[in-house]
């Protein structure tokens, strides 16, 4: 067992085996629970990244004004913009790092699921973890998690498109966010359905978190507006 398998694969095998036991061997529900747990773990980072995105969206008029005023001096313009970011405690790289981090997780899980599907898990299991007698690879009675699923690919692309439009991302970020699910849609035949199911669960929790952030932001704006009026 190499270092990658020891640090990434073995914990995933054991955690998924534990979740599969809780779901009576249903791998589909175990994967959805795994997606929810991972999403909750990275929630603080996501919240910070989205907070920076909202601040940057509000600062766009000032940024455009600086760019217009100093269009002949791009270096100075960038310095002024970075000064604003520093004053507002904004890290413009947070959202990019978060996207790449999500992709790194997805790629790791892609490799993991490709190996785990249909293979023997016992060599990777800790002594205190028991695998269910039978793993059910049929989700909702008709989706074979071992094979590609056009239905799940369409659901994934649709959910991610919706998420992209409700997030306060810049144009470049939106292209990255919108492009990834459609890559899955176009190349879904290369992905076992279990991977797409994970991404569907991950995105559903993401949408819920985005709703919570939007609601909190609206309440803050209303409070500020009321104080200003008074």
Specify the residue positions occupied by each region the protein language model found.
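Helix-loop-helix
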Residues: 1-230
